[in-house]
Regions:
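NTP-dependent nucleotidyl-transfer catalytic core
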Residues: 1-160
């Protein structure tokens, strides 16, 4: 007999029963660290929280696919690598290694997949281009933003 799982919905601050889209394969995606500097306590909190959720889901459902990305290219990384006079690759390898050591120290399980941003640049550019073409995103000062007012289910999203 499976126990129900209740999670807090941050949009209404109420506990709601977790109803999976696919009971045969629960899928969870978590934004991982941007590896520009040594890991800190702010990196540890989501590690621990989502590790507990991952373990709970694995004990409740037969299959759980957990994806946590590693952002290994962005403005902070470029700036930090320039300040340290090392390549972005050298910096991100060093910081990613420290992050993985912390994961191990905190007894966090490895996600099912851990993609790095640099492994998917072409796909990201393609997706961003499509979002802009369809009017769901726009560029401003070399940044791309979602056009959240175009979302159909506005009650499920917060925006200013």
């Amino acid at each position: 007999m499976t126990k129900d799982i209740f999670l807090t919905n941050n949009l209404n601050n109420k506990k709601e029963k977790f109803i999976p889209l696919d009971k045969k394969n629960i899928k969870m995606y978590v934004c991982g660290p941007t590896v520009y500097d040594d890991p800190h306590i702010g990196n540890a909190r989501p590690l621990i929280v989502f590790d507990i959720l991952f373990k709970l889901l694995k004990n409740t459902f037969s299959k759980v696919t957990y994806v946590r990305n590693i952002t290994d290219i962005d403005d902070k990384i470029i700036k930090s690598s320039q300040e340290q006079k090392i390549s972005t690759k050298e910096l991100t390898n060093k910081v990613t290694s420290s992050f993985f050591e912390d994961c191990k120290f905190l007894n966090c399980e490895n996600p099912t997949h851990q993609p790095k941003a640099t492994e998917h640049i072409d796909l990201m550019i393609e997706m961003i281009t499509q979002l802009i073409k369809k009017g769901f995103a726009y560029e401003n000062n070399s940044h791309v933003y979602f056009e959240v007012k175009k979302l159909k289910n506005k009650k499920y999203h917060r925006y200013r």
